[in-house]
Swiss-Prot record:
Disulfide bonding pattern of the chain: none
Residue ranges occupied by any ABC transporter domain in the UniProt entry: 5-227
Organism: Histophilus somni (strain 129Pt) (Haemophilus somnus)
Protein name as catalogued: Lipoprotein-releasing system ATP-binding protein LolD
Keyword Kinase appears in the UniProt entry: no
Assembly information from the UniProt record: The complex is composed of two ATP-binding proteins (LolD) and two transmembrane proteins (LolC and LolE).
Bilayer topology annotation: Peripheral membrane protein
InterPro entries linked: AAA+_ATPase (IPR003593), ABC_transporter-like_ATP-bd (IPR003439), ABC_transporter-like_CS (IPR017871), ABC_transpr_LolD-like (IPR015854), LolD_lipo_ATP-bd (IPR011924), MacB-like_ATP-bd (IPR017911), P-loop_NTPase (IPR027417)
GO cellular component: plasma membrane
Encoding gene per record: lolD
Compartments where located: Cell inner membrane
EC number: 7.6.2.-
Role this protein plays: Part of the ABC transporter complex LolCDE involved in the translocation of mature outer membrane-directed lipoproteins, from the inner membrane to the periplasmic chaperone, LolA. Responsible for the formation of the LolA-lipoprotein complex in an ATP-dependent manner.
Annotated coiled-coil segments of the chain: none
Length: 227
């Protein structure tokens, strides 16, 4: 099995005047294709900051991230954008759906931005929405969907460009327990059936225990869970 992601000695400092805050401390780990990993830790431990580094949304103070063997730190902005479009999908705690667009149109958008054919984008979006259980809700706007349905649309949108890896930052943070469980089950299903790798940041230890591999972030230090 090939290594999809390699994180080497990632350190991140933030400077405010004379005050320097170290958020990540020489974080290193790797991830295989099709793997499902949860990163758990308390609020402020550095989980979301790490996810931003892994997605090329922010740069580390030192260290390097490789996606499919390509360094994010050595890439130009155009190369970085191409890497993200080709290999990565993103899901956040807040769904960030466009209110005036239907679920179908929201999911089509990343493909249209990538200059894909509109018919191809529509067919792909319909298939993905069906896969996440929303075949009968594709023409509804976000305001007509429940919280769980909106997050399913966000997950579908992250999958529409057929990524190798989805980075999910607290994707169930605003949902009730029952809906949270259904979203976790969906992620597991997509991982098993479509072999999509997921790196999931969460503070929900109970649900994280159901996933294959758990990493614990504490005070900017990442370690394997022994439990």
């Amino acid at each position: 099995m090939n290594r999809l992601l390699i994180c080497q000695n990632i350190t991140k400092h933030y400077q405010e005047g004379s005050l320097q805050t170290q958020v990540l401390k020489e974080v290193s780990f790797s991830m295989q294709e099709g793997e499902l990993i949860a990163i758990v830790g308390s609020s402020g431990s550095g989980k979301s900051t790490l996810l931003h580094m892994l997605g090329g949304l922010d740069q580390p103070t030192s260290g390097e991230v490789f996606i499919h063997g390509q360094s994010l730190q050595r890439a130009t902005q155009d190369e970085l954008a191409k890497l993200r479009n080709q290999y990565l999908g993103f899901v956040y705690q807040f769904h960030h759906l466009m209110a005036d667009f239907t679920a179908l149109e929201n999911v089509m958008m990343p493909m249209l931005i990538s200059h894909k054919n509109k018919t191809e984008a529509k067919d792909r979006a319909e298939n993905i929405l069906s896969a996440v259980g929303l075949a009968k809700r594709i023409l509804h706007k976000p305001s007509a969907l429940s919280g769980g349905e909106r997050q399913r649309v966000a997950i579908a949108r992250s999958l529409v460009n057929n990524p190798k890896l989805v980075l999910a930052d607290e994707p169930t943070g605003n949902l009730d327990h029952k809906t949270t469980e259904s979203i976790f089950e969906l992620i597991q299903k997509l991982n098993q059936e479509q072999k999509i790798a997921f790196l999931l940041v969460t503070h929900d230890l109970q649900l994280a225990e159901k996933l294959g591999r758990r990493l614990v972030m504490q005070d900017g230090i990442l370690r394997e869970s022994n439990s």
